[in-house]
């Protein structure tokens, strides 16, 4: 038994390979000593002649044994399924993949039954591999049974707890097929205010966004580079950018590819919200008769993106459902429609779109488009946090440590919140810059004998939060510099922020 580690496999899962002495002899006799994957034709013939003779001998032994058994127990009692033929064994042999497709050995195995058997066996193998991969993704576990968190951090606090998402019963997306949106009870806004949220796939295009890096974005940058190198005199020979966008849209709309349509809708929505790019496109269209103004071009692009996103959302594409819900909640199409955003977020959350799971939790927490429900908000936050969502880890850590959103104020819950804040701090960014600040407040005072006070580490966490853009941490560092490095350990800001009087606690319980 030999143990090898495949470096190309994500997570470096151990791969166990076992081989016997017969395989070693075949490899040493049939293959070149330089490489087992580079075969010369004489070596191939020699190898396959030895293999075929070995298989044929084993087949003769099997037929002789079969005749003896059939003579003793009768022909009818024998199994109907015969032994695998030489062709079947040849097609199922693992080293068959090494040979080229147009090899002379294929002339011996052109039987229809063998080819159909080969296709079935390959199809079943592909289905098994795909099912294993999908089960690993859904379960969040690696091939060796370990959790995905074991690669870089300690397991989450609620790893062993089963988290089941509960969705509202009135998840109605009829407005996707109703452009006017008139008179539907689902279209009523329970809250007309929007909320500034950290999101991985957002409409804030000033921040690097992996999902917004489409092929058309790259083409736009290449177009600018070409214009720069051509100069002012020769740039007229280059096709205007607006023409290329129109041509790209015509081709995409004729196709039935969902991802291509989503990329196009995302790009034109990005262009429609970028004032600088709109002015560049308007300047290119000044010489034409059907020139647009900035406002009319923006309205045209945004409405076109809205139509495409509605069609994709109606067929259940989760990325389109999230982006359309984000546009509704941000007021891109005019009035803020939180009810529609909530329905789209919850629909995408059913399809395991993690950012939509987090946004659904925010809707339940703040009452955006739905009645406030603290248990459901915590439920969705917990699910998103177990899937490595930084903002969900941060919020769940704060709520657990300070006993908010109906969570118990006991030691176990506090320690769970402390662990969630540690995990959120390890993944902190400019979007989630409050996690190091909250963890620093905990280390500044400590908690009983479970969390030892460490002011030096707390100051390092304040510096990390301030570098990410947290203003309160920057203020604390400035006060510490003025006082000669001394920071008060009595009442950290978070303790004052989340401290509740008895009347406030009673009101919060009634609300929950």
From Swiss-Prot:
MF (Gene Ontology): enzyme activator activity
Sel1-like repeats: 318-353, 354-389, 390-429, 433-470
Major location category of this protein: cytoplasm
Keywords: Cell wall biogenesis/degradation, Cytoplasm, Membrane, Repeat, Sporulation
Localization terms from the record: Cytoplasm; Cytoplasmic granule membrane
Topological type in the membrane: Peripheral membrane protein
Biased composition (Acidic residues): 101-113
Annotated InterPro entries: Chitin_Synth_Reg, Sel1-like, TPR-like_helical_dom_sf
Entry annotated with the keyword Repeat: yes
GO CC, alphabetical: cytoplasm; prospore membrane
SUPFAM superfamilies: HCP-like
Upregulating conditions: During sporulation and at high pH.
Ranges for region Disordered: 101-122, 144-164
GO BP terms, alphabetized: ascospore formation; chitin biosynthetic process; fungal-type cell wall organization
Physiological role: Required for the activation of chitin synthase III (CHS3) activity during the sporulation process.
Similarity-based family: Belongs to the SKT5 family.
Protein name as catalogued: Protein SHC1
Protein's organism: Saccharomyces cerevisiae (strain ATCC 204508 / S288c)
């Amino acid at each position: 038994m030999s143990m090898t580690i495949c470096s190309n496999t994500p997570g470096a899962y151990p791969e166990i390979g076992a081989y016997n002495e017969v395989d070693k002899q075949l490899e040493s006799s049939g293959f070149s000593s330089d490489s087992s994957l580079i075969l010369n034709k004489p070596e191939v013939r020699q190898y396959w002649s030895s293999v075929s003779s070995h298989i044929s001998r084993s087949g003769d032994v099997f037929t002789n044994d079969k005749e003896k058994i059939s003579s003793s127990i009768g022909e009818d009692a024998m199994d109907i399924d015969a032994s695998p033929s030489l062709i079947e064994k040849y097609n199922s042999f693992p080293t068959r993949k090494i040979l080229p497709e147009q090899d002379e050995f294929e002339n011996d195995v052109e039987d229809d039954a063998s080819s159909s058997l080969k296709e079935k066996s390959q199809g079943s193998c592909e289905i098994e591999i795909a099912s294993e991969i999908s089960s690993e993704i859904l379960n969040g576990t690696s091939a060796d049974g370990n959790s995905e968190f074991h690669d870089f951090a300690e397991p989450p606090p609620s790893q062993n707890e089963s988290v089941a998402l509960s969705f509202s019963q009135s998840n109605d997306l009829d407005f996707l097929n109703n452009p006017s949106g008139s008179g539907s009870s689902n279209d009523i806004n329970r809250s007309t205010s929007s909320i500034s949220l950290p999101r991985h796939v957002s409409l804030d295009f000033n921040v690097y966004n992996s999902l917004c890096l489409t092929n058309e974005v790259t083409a736009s940058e290449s177009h600018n580079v070409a214009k720069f190198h051509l100069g002012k005199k020769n740039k007229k020979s280059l096709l205007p950018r607006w023409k290329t966008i129109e041509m790209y849209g015509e081709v995409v709309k004729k196709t039935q590819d969902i991802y291509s349509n989503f990329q196009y809708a995302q790009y034109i929505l990005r262009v429609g919200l970028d004032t600088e790019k709109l002015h560049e496109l308007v300047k290119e269209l000044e010489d034409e008769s059907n020139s647009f103004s900035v406002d009319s071009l923006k309205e045209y692009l945004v409405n076109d993106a809205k139509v495409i996103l509605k069609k994709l959302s109606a067929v259940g594409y989760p990325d389109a459902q999230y982006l359309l819900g984000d546009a509704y909640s941000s007021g891109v199409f005019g009035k803020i429609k939180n009810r529609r955003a909530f329905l789209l977020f919850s629909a995408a959350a059913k399809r395991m779109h993690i950012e939509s799971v987090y946004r659904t939790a925010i809707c339940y927490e703040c009452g955006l488009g739905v009645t406030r429900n603290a248990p459901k908000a915590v439920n969705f936050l917990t699910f998103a946090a177990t899937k490595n969502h930084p903002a969900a880890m941060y919020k769940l850590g704060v709520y657990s440590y300070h006993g908010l959103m109906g969570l118990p104020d006991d030691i176990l819950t506090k320690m769970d919140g402390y662990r969630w804040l540690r995990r959120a701090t390890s993944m902190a960014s400019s979007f989630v810059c409050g996690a190091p600040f909250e963890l620093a407040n905990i280390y500044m005072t400590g908690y009983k004998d479970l969390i030892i006070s460490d002011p030096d580490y707390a100051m390092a966490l304040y510096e990390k939060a301030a570098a990410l853009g947290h203003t309160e941490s920057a203020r604390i560092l400035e006060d510490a510099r003025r006082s000669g490095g001394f920071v008060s350990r009595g009442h950290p800001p978070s303790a004052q922020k989340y401290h509740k009087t008895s009347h406030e606690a009673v009101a919060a319980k009634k609300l929950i």
